[in-house]
Amino acid sequence: MPKITFMGAGSTVFAKNVLGDCMMTPALEESRIALYDIDRNRLEESALMLEAINRNNGSKAVIEKYLGVSMRKEALRGADYVVNAIQVGGYDPCTITDFEIPKKYGLRQTIADTLGVGGVFRALRTIPVMLDFARDMEEVCPDAWLLNYTNPMAMLTGAMLTMSSIRTVGLCHSVQVCAPTLLNELCMGYDDRVQVKIAGINHQAWLLECTRDGEDLYPEIKRRAKLYNEGKLEIGTWEERRAMLSNGEPLPGQWEERMKEEYDLYRKTGRHGDMVRLELMLRFGYYITESSEHNAEYTPYFIKQRYPELIGRFNIPLDEYPRRCIRQIEEWESRREELTKNPMLTHERSREYASYIMEAMETGHPVKIGGNVLNKGLITNLPQRACVEVPCMADRNGIQPTVIGDLPEQCAALNRTNINVQLMTVEAARTRKREDIYRAVMLDPHTSAELSIDDIVSMCDEMIEAHRDWMPEYS
């Protein structure tokens, strides 16, 4: 049976989804599971949780714990699959720093984990650690597949694919939920008859085709999107809305509360949580995979000191990621007992790609995924060294990506503005030169639209100093 190593196993809820899924899969249920983390308490909590699932499911997985950098190589030794879910520097202090220093310069952000100055510095903290993983893997499990879930996805996956020999694919939820989110939001409903084609880059891949029973849904999507952004789309009663957005399935309490808040906001003000994406679709012609709060900071159009009214007009949640971190910390306190001290804990297989990929590689039964891979002629009007997100087939032969050809020119053009930052950040991680960090941030669409070159350099210098414990190579 395969060995699965989970890097960052203290991500307890995510470990439950990925490794719980493996325990629910016949081809993987007897796997040897190696949990690795640098936080003793979180590692122990994840192990307790997974042991309960293993026992209650009747699985025969062998669960092992590896604590700290000195045990990392042993955790990886002989692995067939390595799942990466680390965060270097955590919420406090690094995420706080990623928001507070730019704010001093007048640069406002929403999520700051994928692009912009926050995304660049998150990548520069993380790439050296992941390359350490890669060096160990090249020694003790050179044929393993690395399944990367950590952001910034394109930068980290691109670094692994160009700076190591490890077979790597980047995985993100946004492709899976793109069409269901769009169609349900617009009261069109999503079902198995819907077929889609999605390609581009992570967090900015494009819904190129969306059909139901062969009928192009885009004309109706755009008609409803315009009404929705004008506050004129009829969305029904709360009970009808809830059933539509949840596909009739039960929701965790916190999600239902947030959906109700969104519903009430729309009823009261005509504003909603996806206004940026729908505006981009109406202007560029195609819907983007990742959320409005992300895409508000990937472009120069929405967060602008000169036009402060855009924040309210498009319902842009500035400083959203720190709020989420605080909420997750608070919610973890209530979930800890449920997950780590519940002897009857069970699990239902989720939609996470990881177990389906491993199952396909073990059994040879193929599965289609959206994967982040190197652009070796896949999207012909994007740079060849870019990390692109395209449909892929996983089977016993590995990951086979699909050739897309040219994207619509306006879509490729917007992607290239983000790719510039991604490639320059990977170059900065390779050269360890401050000048390359400056260039990466200078190329960022949102940052360069708001700050002068001198301010960008000063901001980067201050960020480097603040992050010196996690980025000693640049200090």
Predicted segments with their positions:
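Internal, well-ordered domain-core segments that constitute the primary functional module
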Residues: 133-221
